[in-house]
Curated annotation (Swiss-Prot):
Keywords: ATP-binding, Helicase, Host endoplasmic reticulum, Host membrane, Hydrolase, Membrane, Methyltransferase, Nucleotide-binding, Transferase. Residues 713-976 are annotated as: ATP-dependent helicase. Coiled coil: none annotated. It is a peripheral membrane protein. Belongs to the bromoviridae replication protein 1a family. Residues 72-290 form the Alphavirus-like MT domain. Residues 51-409 are annotated as: Methyltransferase. One of its GO terms (biological process) is mRNA modification. This is Replication protein 1a. InterPro entries: (+)RNA_virus_helicase_core_dom, 1a_necrotic_phenotyp-det_dom, Alphavirus-like_MT_dom, CMV_1a_C, P-loop_NTPase. Residues 840-993 form the (+)RNA virus helicase C-terminal domain.
Amino acid sequence: MATSSFNINELVASHGDKGLLATALVDKTTHEQLEEQLQHQRRGRKVYIRNVLGVKDSEVIRNRYGGKYDLHLTQQEFASQGLAGALRLCGTLDCLDSFPSSGLRQDLVLDFGGSWVTHYLRGHNVHCCSPCLGIRDKMRHSERLMNMRKIILNDPQQFDGRQPDFCTQPAADCKVQAHFAISIHGGYDMGFRGLCEAMNAHGTTILKGTMMFDGAMMFDDQGVIPELNCQWRKIRSAFSETEDVTPLVGKLNSTVFSRVRKFKTMVAFDFINESTMSYVHDWENIKSFLTDQTYSYRGMTYGIERCVIHAGIMTYKIIGVPGMCPPELIRHCIWFPSIKDYVGLKIPASQDLVEWKTVRILTSTLRETEEIAMRCYNDKKAWMEQFKVILGVLSAKSSTIVINGMSMQSGERIDINDYHYIGFAILLHTKMKYEQLGKMYDMWNASSISKWFAALTRPLRVFFSSVVHALFPTLRPREEKEFLIKLSTFVTFNEECSFDGGEEWDVISSAAYVATQAVTDGKILAAQKAEKLAEKLAQPVSEVSDSPETSSQTPDDTADVCGKEREVSELDSLSAQTRSPITRVAERATAMLEYAAYEKHLHDTTVSNLKRIWNMAGGDDKRSFLEGNLKFVFDSYFTVDPMVNIHFSTGRWVRPVPEGIVYPVGYNERGLGPKSDGELYIVNSECVICNSESLSTVYGRSLQTPTGTISQVDGVAGCGKTMPIKSIFEPSTDMIVTANKKSAQDVRMALFKSSDSKEACTFVRTADSVLLNECPTVSRVLEDEVVLLHFGQLCAVMSKLKAVRAICFGDAEQIAFSSRDASFDMRFSKIIPDETSDADTTFRSPQDVVPLVRLMATKALPKGTHSKYTKWVSQSKVRRSVTSRAIASVTLVDLDSSRFYITMTQADKASLISRAKEMNLPKTFWNERIKTVHESQGISEDHVTLVRLKSTKCDLFKQFSYCLVALTRHKVTFRYEYCGVLNGDLIASVARA
């Protein structure tokens, strides 16, 4: 192995953040070393959620865990507390991911109150403490036993020799020792201190858990957690719930209220509109997670950290440390963002006006009610008349109103029991303000008593007022502060933590011991992993279930089993050059001229079409003016091109601009080009990406015909064309060029784990980006999906980069570059390589796809045509994957977030997108999971559905290239759903064969 001629450390030190070469080399080396481990981790991060979730609930769970797990929302079954159950599963996996998952005994994890069957079925190294505290716990144990039996019967070999690891003792009584623990909604019955004592009994150092959280519990008696659709209420006695009409004897004999009778405050969690089991827990235990910070117990000090609060679920961790703890002030805040728009209003709680209570009311409601009441206030009116005015205004600001046949909520509804008291408090508050203002006015002509009182010093005035208030309590509400209370949006807790636990903890020695132990355990795990990999590689390709919907572990296992074959470079068998250099240069020069003429033709066609529309609408080449018939003209063109639009000088568009669409250019009397917001102009679909004129002029900027070698690796679909690019890429000499932006983003993510970083955008660019922008020169170009490029475009890229070698990857039999204008005579678009190599082994396509593609090639290709698909083979484990079914309309298409949908035409794609919008599916689904066959070239998915919604003539279903792309996008299942019979449909003919 050759010795490196430069020092990486010196290179990075000298260039700093500009050392792209060193950064790219480190990324490349790291990727090669960790590729197999990352594949294993990706398999473990797939989470299947069977509960049926609405669009809003799906967004909640994707926002919380979508970046960490590969979520599969299968929408299989309705379940009570659907979102809460899904969050509980993801929360369990999230907490487990915080700890080592080696399977070694020293990495055992405890679960206080969790579901042991979940860990058993997933093979987690977890011991569950699942005590039977009541009938509900015993019911759960029985249900878990039956679920375990049902799953084992379906796949007994997977669970052979595996035993569930759990006990029915309380967490503090269990003797199993472990460094790590989790508690998923298990802290309600234990409290913060109870969890700390359980950790001490188990020798646990770190615990991570989750619980439902609402900061309003600190000051309210009831509230709602909207994301979980859960209502909570504090219960202080057996008679506090007025909705409960159970007889008194039944209440006193019930299990819940037998505890409540002991004057404990309980918190009941009820799920709204779900007549299911509720949960009742001790308020002191729940409050401890909000107020407590540390707890010292038997030589250990435990501290809690509140990590993430999202969707009404708080994730926290408790860490225990031994030895002495120096004094330290620990501070934390509990925030109440839900009350920022409210103000506290004191209302009478007794007729003698001595006892008052505080209620919350919207600041806007109080302000508007008081404003109108002040204007209508008249001291000569009876107090009842004033009261009626205030109640009328208050009712209007807190009731449902109807506008144009639509009901709207004005303000916020007020409790029926407090409604009149709130109005009375506002009346007193209004009268008090008038009196205060009157006193200020009377100060100019004050009496002798007023002058004497004003002459007193402030301490004497305060003392005098206090004596009067004490002797005459009914005068108390005559101060403003007794009516309006400013509600704080947070509560602060300060706690001084110190503990004398004896000797000081030697952190340095502990770190050395943990590091040594981890190295030893890592070697053991590496040896075990190597043995398993060797056994897997030695096994022949085995047959899986005949069910087309069975996903198993096929996609990722295929990557592991076939990893060795993918590392073999297809470049080793490239043939030598056989054509004359003069002939090659002439072909390339001709292709470059043709591509320049083609782009110029597209630009001229765009200008001609826009000019025709402009003139038909009444415009000309001299003035910016359109006549009244423009609506008829644009409505007619809109049926052909939905992107046709008019921009007026006021900034208004005739039709709403689709989301995400920007028109950089437009057309008016000054021609086609960039326009300002104050201009009148028209646009069409060609104005979204209008670079044809720039591309046509690039070839005149001293671009000479390249003389370097063009090598092409012509591989079948799924042969792993991206892997060789990653393996042979050298940042110092290479640049990766793709045909479109989507391919560039995929390569950047595969190579740099980022699609927009500086390094990724420097080394991976589209062909148009290279031609239109400044770029460094390189000696070698790596071209991905080269068949989508015009030959002249490839030659121009080589000339611009001054490359002496172009290594091109692509399938010559898939969809190639095609002219967007049928009137242009295209002759030199096909790539003419100097060296070629074939790759006939696919790692993506299942076994049954191979004969189907052969049959399609026999039917569609002319006789005597040589196709590499006549001898291609598959290394996939999946035996059967292709199914088909007839449907009556688009409403019968089963839209599932786990599947990828493709169509041959844009019309069918638009119909699917409309159907997805009707079903309220997320925007990401119909933006990313529905594509045309042309748009999906280069994409690989587990489950693919091809949809044909019309039986009218469509030549694309007769073309081998389009049908080939459609049938080779999947790794596990392919479903063809079609409406009616279409003559010459290749896919339908082979799917039924």
